[in-house]
């Protein structure tokens, strides 16, 4: 395992000694992959290419004896405040169905709902005793999101979000966490907490998880505002393509996507960002590099229609599988059975932790 300079620097805050680096890189813990995804309902293409597809590719390529865990993190979904119960329930069901439709295999990936494993919250509380509010308040994501609360009435869940995130991983002693670069600081904090716990209690209970970031296509951006990433939080429905969108909806959204009137299509992010954004999306959907696409004779209308055709072709089987799942009890069955399996692992690890710190 190779640690970045930032990561090693972060561990220094917990009393880490540089000559102990080898101890961290020779963990005897079995390899366990873990990641989480918030239940925001139906995923869009940004979610698909950014996290779901990389996970399914990993799932289908690693040794079958390696445990892979994917959590639908419904407790994180209320970190900014409560949601209507029916909305959260529906979003969780839709996200789970979407993951299965996109290729997440519940027989290969332990796909479960976070709130079905109460041990995670208990371990989050324990980790909180090793962290300070000042360090949590300095994290960039906290600084950014707290600005939404102009009156200063910031939910506690926003501040402690990284502790729960760390508990998600450490509860299962995960060794590898596939996440984007935007989560690097939270993962650094996670590693620091694992090290601090081990050092405080003179144990090796927790592995120091490593971040797995794959090289991928350019970040999927909004169809209406190409300077921003594709998101449900801004831009409106026409700014994104969801994985269950109908063919007609996909065509309409592509036709109305921002472009320009500069004639033939060229790839120029500096001067033609909107057109380049559509080419990046076409590249991701067709699994080709932008340099391999012959768009020399395309107009912007050609680009939009070709993009719509490619997106519909890619999403058609996913859309069909999602619809099939709506008429069965498979989603609930997966959440129930895998929730039991996840709790069994978590309870065993929690008992070890409780004995270590003196609760037992």
Curated annotation (Swiss-Prot):
<keyword id="KW-0547">Nucleotide-binding</keyword>
<dbReference type="GO" id="GO:0005524">
    <property type="term" value="F:ATP binding"/>
</dbReference>
<keyword id="KW-0030">Aminoacyl-tRNA synthetase</keyword>
<feature type="short sequence motif" description="'HIGH' region">
    <location>
        <begin position="39"/>
        <end position="47"/>
    </location>
</feature>
<dbReference type="InterPro" id="IPR014729">
    <property type="entry name" value="Rossmann-like_a/b/a_fold"/>
</dbReference>
<dbReference type="GO" id="GO:0005759">
    <property type="term" value="C:mitochondrial matrix"/>
</dbReference>
<dbReference type="GO" id="GO:0004830">
    <property type="term" value="F:tryptophan-tRNA ligase activity"/>
</dbReference>
<feature type="binding site">
    <location>
        <begin position="44"/>
        <end position="47"/>
    </location>
    <ligand>
        <name>ATP</name>
    </ligand>
</feature>
<protein>
    <recommendedName>
        <fullName>Tryptophan--tRNA ligase, mitochondrial</fullName>
        <ecNumber>6.1.1.2</ecNumber>
    </recommendedName>
</protein>
<dbReference type="Pfam" id="PF00579">
    <property type="entry name" value="tRNA-synt_1b"/>
</dbReference>
<dbReference type="InterPro" id="IPR050203">
    <property type="entry name" value="Trp-tRNA_synthetase"/>
</dbReference>
<keyword id="KW-0436">Ligase</keyword>
<feature type="binding site">
    <location>
        <position position="38"/>
    </location>
    <ligand>
        <name>ATP</name>
    </ligand>
</feature>
<feature type="compositionally biased region" description="Basic and acidic residues">
    <location>
        <begin position="220"/>
        <end position="230"/>
    </location>
</feature>
<keyword id="KW-0648">Protein biosynthesis</keyword>
<keyword id="KW-0067">ATP-binding</keyword>
<keyword id="KW-0809">Transit peptide</keyword>
<comment type="function">
    <text>Catalyzes the attachment of tryptophan to tRNA(Trp).</text>
</comment>
<feature type="short sequence motif" description="'KMSKS' region">
    <location>
        <begin position="229"/>
        <end position="233"/>
    </location>
</feature>
<dbReference type="InterPro" id="IPR002306">
    <property type="entry name" value="Trp-tRNA-ligase"/>
</dbReference>
<dbReference type="GO" id="GO:0005739">
    <property type="term" value="C:mitochondrion"/>
</dbReference>
<feature type="binding site">
    <location>
        <begin position="180"/>
        <end position="182"/>
    </location>
    <ligand>
        <name>ATP</name>
    </ligand>
</feature>
<dbReference type="GO" id="GO:0070183">
    <property type="term" value="P:mitochondrial tryptophanyl-tRNA aminoacylation"/>
</dbReference>
<keyword id="KW-0496">Mitochondrion</keyword>
<feature type="region of interest" description="Disordered">
    <location>
        <begin position="220"/>
        <end position="241"/>
    </location>
</feature>
<comment type="similarity">
    <text>Belongs to the class-I aminoacyl-tRNA synthetase family.</text>
</comment>
<feature type="binding site">
    <location>
        <begin position="229"/>
        <end position="233"/>
    </location>
    <ligand>
        <name>ATP</name>
    </ligand>
</feature>
<feature type="binding site">
    <location>
        <position position="168"/>
    </location>
    <ligand>
        <name>L-tryptophan</name>
    </ligand>
</feature>
<dbReference type="InterPro" id="IPR002305">
    <property type="entry name" value="aa-tRNA-synth_Ic"/>
</dbReference>
<dbReference type="InterPro" id="IPR001412">
    <property type="entry name" value="aa-tRNA-synth_I_CS"/>
</dbReference>
């Amino acid at each position: 395992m190779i640690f970045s300079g930032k990561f090693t620097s972060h561990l220094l805050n917990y009393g880490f000694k540089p000559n102990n680096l080898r101890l961290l890189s020779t963990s005897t813990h079995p390899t366990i992959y873990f990641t989480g995804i918030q239940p925001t309902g139906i995923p869009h293409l940004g979610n698909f290419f950014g996290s779901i597809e990389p996970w399914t590719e990993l799932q289908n390529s690693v040794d079958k004896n390696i445990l892979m865990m994917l959590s639908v993190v419904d407790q994180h979904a209320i970190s900014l405040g409560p949601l209507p119960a029916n909305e959260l329930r529906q979003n969780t069901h839709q996200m789970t169905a979407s993951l299965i439709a996109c290729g997440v295999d519940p027989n290969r990936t332990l796909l479960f709902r976070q709130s079905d494993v109460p041990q995670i919250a208990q371990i989050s509380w324990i980790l909180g005793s090793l962290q300070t509010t000042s360090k949590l308040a300095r994290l960039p994501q906290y600084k950014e999101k707290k600005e939404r609360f102009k009156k200063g009435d910031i939910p506690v869940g926003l501040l402690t979000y990284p502790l729960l995130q760390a508990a998600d991983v450490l509860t299962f002693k995960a060794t590898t966490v596939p996440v984007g670069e935007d989560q690097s600081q939270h993962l650094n904090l996670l590693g620091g907490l694992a090290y601090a716990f081990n050092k405080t209690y003179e144990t090796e209970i927790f592995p120091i998880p490593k971040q797995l970031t794959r090289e991928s296509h350019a970040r999927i951006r909004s169809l209406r505002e190409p300077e921003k990433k594709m998101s449900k939080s801004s831009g409106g429905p026409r700014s994104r393509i969801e994985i269950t969108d109908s063919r007609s909806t996909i065509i309409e959204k592509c036709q109305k996507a921002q472009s320009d009137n500069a004639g033939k299509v060229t790839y120029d992010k500096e001067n033609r960002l909107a057109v380049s954004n559509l080419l990046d999306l076409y590249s991701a959907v067709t699994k080709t590099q932008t340099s391999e696409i012959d768009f020399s004779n395309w107009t912007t209308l050609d680009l939009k229609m070709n993009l719509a055709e490619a997106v519909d072709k890619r999403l058609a089987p996913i859309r069909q599988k999602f619809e099939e799942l709506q008429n069965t009890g498979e989603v609930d069955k997966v959440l129930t059975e895998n929730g039991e399996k996840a709790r069994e692992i978590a309870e065993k690890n929690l008992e070890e932790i409780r004995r270590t710190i003196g609760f037992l």
